[in-house]
Amino acid sequence: MVMGLHLLLLVFILGLGLTPPTLAQNDIRYIKFLDQHYDPKTKNGNDKYCEKMMRLRNMISPCKEINTFIHGNKASIKAICGNQNGEPHNGNQRISKSAFQVTICRHIGGSPRPPCRYRATAGFRNLVVACENDLPVHLDESIFRP
């Protein structure tokens, strides 16, 4: 029993040593990207939506100047980092081939401390993202593309 436990522990430790740390870091950056920008449930955000989401996502201490929420599915967003839904843009960035429904929340002045007030702009935009290991890790901008 003890020998089997030691063998299991050894296999686990070896597995940790063989996992590249960059994979775990990229997963964390991708999760942070989703936390800041992904909201599949809402289709059209308004000012109250922005104030609520910015508070729920902890982006109000200090008040974040601007944030874009993407209302699409994860597979389509991830596909920007590949050829299915993305193409090279400005060096190491990628731009989506298709437009996504988004809500852009802009801080409307006043104090950088809560309570934060936001103005919502909803629409369809192409996304410009930075990718690492085929995962989006930074939303650079959302643009109208002819």
Swiss-Prot record:
Annotated catalytic residues: 37, 138
Enzyme Commission code(s) on record: 3.1.27.-
In-chain residues carrying the UniProt-annotated modification Pyrrolidone carboxylic acid: 25
Subcellular location: Secreted; Nucleus; Nucleus, Nucleolus; Cytoplasm, Stress granule
Primary residence: secreted
Disulfide bonds: 50-105, 63-116, 81-131
CDD domains per record: RNase_A_canonical
GO molecular function: actin binding; copper ion binding; DNA binding; endonuclease activity; heparin binding; protein homodimerization activity; RNA nuclease activity; signaling receptor binding
Domain of life: Eukaryota
Residues bound to tRNA: 105
Keyword Nucleus annotated: yes
One BP term from GO: defense response to Gram-positive bacterium
Entries under InterPro entries matching the protein: RNaseA, RNaseA-like_dom_sf, RNaseA_AS, RNaseA_domain
Keyword line: Angiogenesis, Cytoplasm, Developmental protein, Differentiation, Disulfide bond, DNA-binding, Endonuclease, Hydrolase, Nuclease, Nucleus, Protein synthesis inhibitor, Pyrrolidone carboxylic acid, Secreted, Signal, Stress response
Hydrolase in keyword set: yes
GO CC, alphabetical: angiogenin-PRI complex; basement membrane; cytoplasm; cytoplasmic stress granule; endocytic vesicle; extracellular space; nucleolus; nucleus
Ranges spanned by the short sequence motif Nucleolar localization signal, renumbered to the chain: 55-59
Activity control summary: Has weak tRNA ribonuclease activity by itself due to partial autoinhibition by its C-terminus, which folds into a short alpha-helix that partially occludes the substrate-binding site. In absence of stress, the ribonuclease activity is inhibited by RNH1 in the cytoplasm. In response to stress, dissociates from RNH1 in the cytoplasm and associates with cytoplasmic ribosomes with vacant A-sites: ribosomes directly activate the tRNA ribonuclease activity of ANG by refolding the C-terminal alpha-helix. In response to stress, the angiogenic activity of ANG is inhibited by RNH1 in the nucleus.
UniProt signal peptide: 1-24
Family as reported in the entry's similarity comment: Belongs to the pancreatic ribonuclease family.
Function (record text): Secreted ribonuclease that can either promote or restrict cell proliferation of target cells, depending on the context. Endocytosed in target cells via its receptor PLXNB2 and translocates to the cytoplasm or nucleus. Under stress conditions, localizes to the cytoplasm and promotes the assembly of stress granules (SGs): specifically cleaves a subset of tRNAs within anticodon loops to produce tRNA-derived stress-induced fragments (tiRNAs), resulting in translation repression and inhibition of cell proliferation. tiRNas also prevent formation of apoptosome, thereby promoting cell survival.
Quaternary structure and partners: Homodimer. Interacts with RNH1; inhibiting ANG ribonuclease activity. Interacts with PCNA.
Name this polypeptide is given: Angiogenin
Natural source organism: Aotus trivirgatus
Organism phylogeny: Eukaryota, Metazoa, Chordata, Craniata, Vertebrata
